[in-house]
Amino acid sequence: MITIRIGTRPSRLAVRQAEIVASAIRHAGYEVEIVKYRSEGDSDLKSPLYSIGKTGVFVERLNSLILSGDIDAAVHSAKDIPYEIDRRLRISAVMPRGRFEDALVSENPLSKLPPGSVIGTSSLRRRYQILYQRKDVKVSNIRGNVDTRIEKMRSEGMAGIVMALAAIDRLELNLRYWPFDPEKFVPAPNQGIIAVVSEDGSKASEVLSSINDADTYDDMMAERSITQGLKLGCSTPVGILSRHTGKGMRILAQFFAMDGSDMMMFDQHVDGLDDVDGIVSYIRENLPEEYGYKL
């Protein structure tokens, strides 16, 4: 029987996501081995993610191990995968999307926090979304895996931290949290999606294609197409969300000025993936130049 070796980062969330993929592969009738590797981004826990200046800092190491033959596939959070990867590789499968919303892990919702409260996040998008709603709170950089961030929140006296609901669900965390309205806090492109990369044309790619969730894959590709079409980096303060409506796809795109001074929301409906290019053109034509994007 074929054994598929899947690589993952060693964090609890990354391993849990690999286990979800492994379960799907086993259900399809194949053996699985989970292999853990550490990345550069796991070592630098002080710099904000948006300041590291390296797209896919958690992804490149694992993907290189596919090409070297050390593993057959790599499990990633889809939002971490650069929009251009080695042409020998492909995203062969995605799991059904988890809850894509962000949430404030806190004793109180954002609207009830006292002025001057400190909220932790390393995401520029989340920073600006919070400050757009509450200019009287403070946002502090916080890095590390889920457990590290929760511990830092408590030890440093923060009022809360921002986390993806999918992470809270997958780790079955017993936390008090307040989901953000995705109409106002549009999540990062591909948030909540587990993706599996393998070598194009390989046996692993064939196996993985059999466990792919088609609707989630289409939403992922719509969000990635917009981001790639506009040449947006992973650190830009932008949220993009695609959702199937039964009559096509509804796409929300939230853009903040690079300095956080203003925000613009795009809300578009398309029949399918082939129409996404029209959204790219519309955003390019209507996003103010003073926002600082080079589209």
From Swiss-Prot:
State if Transferase is listed as a keyword: yes
Top-level taxon in the UniProt lineage:
Archaea
Q: Which Pfam families match?
A: Porphobil_deam
Q: Which CDD domains match?
A: PBP2_HemC_archaea (cd13644)
Q: Which reaction equations make up its catalytic activity?
A: 4 porphobilinogen + H2O = hydroxymethylbilane + 4 NH4(+)
Hey, which pathway is this one from? Porphyrin-containing compound metabolism; protoporphyrin-IX biosynthesis; coproporphyrinogen-III from 5-aminolevulinate: step 2/4
S-(dipyrrolylmethanemethyl)cysteine modifications at: 234
Q: Do you know which Gene3D superfamilies this protein is assigned to? A: Periplasmic binding protein-like II, Porphobilinogen deaminase, C-terminal domain
The protein's required cofactor(s) are namely: dipyrromethane
Q: Keyword annotations for this protein?
A: Porphyrin biosynthesis, Transferase
Q: Which InterPro entries match?
A: HemC (IPR000860), Porphobilin_deaminase_cofac_BS (IPR022419), Porphobilin_deaminase_N (IPR022417), Porphobilinogen_deaminase_C_sf (IPR036803)
Q: PROSITE patterns given for it?
A: PORPHOBILINOGEN_DEAM
**Gene Ontology MF terms in the entry:** hydroxymethylbilane synthase activity
Q: What PANTHER family does the record point to?
A: PORPHOBILINOGEN DEAMINASE
Miscellaneous notes for this chain?
Answer: The porphobilinogen subunits are added to the dipyrromethane group.
- Annotated protein name in UniProt: Probable porphobilinogen deaminase
Q: Which organism is it from?
A: Thermoplasma acidophilum (strain ATCC 25905 / DSM 1728 / JCM 9062 / NBRC 15155 / AMRC-C165)
Question: Coding gene?
Answer: hemC
